[in-house]
Every structure is written in structure tokens, then in C-alpha cells.
Amino acid sequence: MARKKISLIGAGNIGGELAALIARRELGDVVLFDIPDKEGLAKGKALDLEQNGAVLGYDSKITGTSNWADVAGAEVVIITAGVPRKPGMSRDDLLGINLKIIRGVAENLKTHCPNAFVIVVSNPLDAMVYELKKVTGFAGKKVVGMAGVLDSGRFQLFLAREMNVAVKDVRAMVLGGHGDTMVPVTSYCTINGIPVKQLVAADKLGAIVERTRNGGGEIVKLMGTSAYYAPASAAVTATRWCRSSATAPSTASPSSSWSAATSWRRSSTGRAAAAARS
């Protein structure tokens, strides 16, 4: 039986880590795509990861390419293409150059992957999701941004470290845009079932909320470029959304998607999880 195809647009840090995670979990065969000037990078990473499979025991096929024909027919497409942030830059500073890139990707997806479920990672994320949906004409439920999973994970981690508890004991969710407008929902956050506001002082909670909003920028300052381990894991989590049925048990996961003129966070079951951005 043929495996499902998952195409990754962009073979940089996030794209490479995505390919590794997907292959190890054998979620499908992977096509790692990049522009012709970076085809060697895509092919080299693909070959390295296939050899890694022989060591670790996974059997996913990984193909590096710069040919859109190899992307065709993918069930899932994850887009990481674009220029990453540098120290001192906001996500919005990337708008001009990455908008041109996302438009080119969108035109090719219309031709080669008209039925794909598309997950956007490129920044500024909410604008990229909107532009890709607009250019492709795909249904809003078929084009999502992974930001909510990543932002919620950062919020969850910072709370766990503050309270010295296991990350899995914290329930936290971040809604809104992937940037300064994100809203860590403290009123619905719990630690072992106890509302976080009963456990964390208001000033400390406020500092954690602010650190969550600046979580990506903190890493950019330290590394000189954007994060990629956690964003890749968040995007892999998002691949489950296209596989879950409306009745299957599922964890609610926030994402960025567009319906008409409104940006909505949606759950992994496809139901609206919260209202528009603040």
C-alpha cells in the first residue's frame, strides 16, 4: 500500500527538521522542495535522512527536488519557504519579501496540489495564510497556520518552569495573531486542574504572558535566526487535523485560518475554537 505524500516547501532549518520528524514517525513519504539554486541542499538533506532511516529503522521515502511536478498529488503541504527573522526584526518586517514568495508558491499549489491540506509556517504567519488562501482560492478549512500550537506550547512551558511542575500538567492556550496581538488565555489556564490565577501572582503571570508574546524574538536574539525545532514539531502536530474525523477524540489545537474577512482560531476537529483576533 502506497504511503501518503507530504510535501515540504522550503528545505531550510524548519523544512529539514520537519522532514526528519515526519520520517521518524512514518507519517508518509516526504518531498523536500526548494528553489533550483538550493536543489542540492534539498537533495542532500533527503539523502542524509534516508540513510538515517537505515540506522534508526524507519522506511519513509524522502525525495529532494526543485521540480513542482514532484510535489504534485500531496495530501499535505507544509510551507516554510521565506526569509527568516534576524535580530531586531519583527515578523511584520518580513512581509514584503515573503509575500512575493508565498504568491509564487500559491500559484504552483493551485496547479499541482489543488486538493491538499496546507499548513503555513512562514512569517508573518497570519498575513501569509490569508494571501495563500486568496491566491489559491482554497477553502478556509484547507489552509491553516500552525502558530497557535507553537505559542500555546511556549506559554505552557514557561508556566511549568515557573511552578516547577511537569509540562504535561499544564493546560494553556494562546489565541489571536502570531505576534504582538496574540492572547494567552489565562482565564482558562490550569495546572493540575487548578486555575493558574490561584497559583501564580498577577505580576509573575503578566511577565510570563509577555515572555510568551516575545518567545520567538528571544530565540532570534540568542541564535541570530528563527527557531526551528519547536515550529517544526508544531507543524507536524497540525498534520493530524486533516486525518481526524469530526467524531474522533481529539485535542483542541488553535491555528490561524481565514473565513471571509475574519481570522479564526480553529480546533483540530474543524470547529471554531474562538473568535477573531484581538
Give short role names for the model-derived ranges:
Residues 81, 117-197:
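Rossmann-fold dinucleotide-binding core
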Residues 22:
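Aromatic pocket-lining residues of Rossmann-like dinucleotide-binding sites
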Residues 167-278:
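NAD(P)-dependent Rossmann-like dehydrogenase/reductase catalytic/cofactor-binding core
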Residues 11-12:
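Glycine-rich Rossmann-fold phosphate-binding loop(s) that bind the pyrophosphate
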Residues 87-139:
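Rossmann-fold NAD(P)-binding glycine/threonine-rich loop
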Residues 15-16:
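N-terminal Rossmann-fold NAD(P) dinucleotide-binding loop
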Residues 33-74:
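Conserved N-terminal Rossmann-fold NAD(P) cofactor-binding segment
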